[in-house]
Swiss-Prot record:
Pathway where it operates: Carbohydrate degradation; glycolysis; pyruvate from D-glyceraldehyde 3-phosphate: step 3/5
HAMAP family with a match to the protein in the record: PGAM_GpmA (MF_01039)
Protein name: 2,3-bisphosphoglycerate-dependent phosphoglycerate mutase 2
The species this protein was found in: Nitrosomonas europaea (strain ATCC 19718 / CIP 103999 / KCTC 2705 / NBRC 14298)
Subunit structure: Homodimer.
InterPro entries: His_Pase_superF_clade-1, His_PPase_superfam, PG/BPGM_mutase_AS, Phosphogly_mut1
Amino acid sequence: MKKLVLLRHGESIWNQENRFTGWTDVDLTPKGLKEAEEAGRLLRENGFSFDIAYTSLLKRAIRTLWIALDEMDQMWTPIELNWRLNERHYGALQGLNKAETAKQYGDEQVLVWRRSYDIRPPSITINDERYPGFDLRYRNMSSGDIPLAESLKDTVARFLPYWNQSIAPQIKAEKKVIIAAHGNSLRALIKHLDNISDQDILNCNIPTGIPLVYELDDDLKPLNSYYLGDAGQIGEAISAVANQGKSGA
């Protein structure tokens, strides 16, 4: 049996402010820093160690991984960073408050933008200051790969090649792997692993800073999955994520 650990970054500044974040490079809040420490503690106390770690090019995920590994006394773990693990690009919604956007467009429309599979939010333009092509970290990307907005389907399409070519072979080679990433990039992977339908993925909500363990067979098919930590607190955290895009939240 092989194990894979997925970790959504700790609470970010824009999580706290209930804003659409996407590829905006915001940092962790004090609560997010503590969540990352707690994730590392849970992993250490449950006997986890890692041969390789993967994360995105966004500091909230990178810092979460650093802190968790530090708490485990495993800062020496090799880390690969790749844009394909970035959060879904929320286009013109990036920076907007989710509840205020729901008041303007309605809860149902915002839920579709946030949680549907194949519907993109409104796009930015290449002249928008939020366009990733202006950011040095993406200087080696082809212009065709740089998103103006993404659906979850788009996120799956750019995540899975990296999973298949880089991450999955490591797990099959008996390497112990952790992926520290984002709500939607992790949903993309979970959809693939658990073979979740396009409709049911709407209801998949991943809390910040809580390790999610997958037990996999030799073909990387899930045998079991579970969060580490207190079940009541995990349930509350999942509910909080589900309520972020509601006008009354």
